[in-house]
Amino acid sequence: EYTKEAAKVEGIAAVYFSTRPDSINESYISELKNTLLEVSSEIELAFEFGLQTVNYKTLAEVNRQHGLAEFIDAVLTAKKFNVEVGAHMILNLPGDSREDVIEGARILSALEVNHVKLHALYIRKNSVFAKKYKEGEIEICSLEEYIERVILFLENLSPDIAVQRLIGRAPDDGTVFINWDTPWWEIHDLIIKEMNDRNTYQGRSFNYLKGKALTKF
């Protein structure tokens, strides 16, 4: 019913489902497409999957209850239906390194997702992470490090993938950490400025697919 109601909104072009990668299968996607067809054949179906990180240990630490395999399966399953697929990534999860960030960009590029949204971790009050944060069990990287990670991610990301977000937002109320107490738009502008100052761009290091090691063929 929700899908039908969303599809009936005047001027709507697509209905996006943002969900976990272990929460879809072919039968579910087929049912969603048929539901949209009951309203209009011109409304597209699209998915966004929350991967967050490619580091399995980090995924377990933040209790995601899924690994990289489930994300890959979700993307490949959705692509069978010729629908747009996006991914959400958090670039400053405790335990993740710059190498994890780069590998995340490479995997999304290899899977040819259509778009990606980047986030910085925010911590809600009364959560497990809030307790660990207050007790010093986890550390959040600096804003400067986050900016560095975003740039590394973008440099390694296929230029064909749309980047729809460089930093996320969350309500100040009820959080113990969010965006280094800096407005999201200011962080966004700092990222763009730093990239311009370095004369760098998305896809600068995108040179690792399609048999890079081959020299003859």
Predicted regions and their residues:
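Conserved strand-turn element in the central/C-terminal portion of the radical SAM core barrel
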Residues: 22, 50, 55-56, 78-100, ...
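Core AdoMet radical
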Residues: 1, 7-25, 43-70, 117
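Short, well-ordered secondary-structure micro-motifs
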Residues: 27-28, 60, 98, 128-130, ...
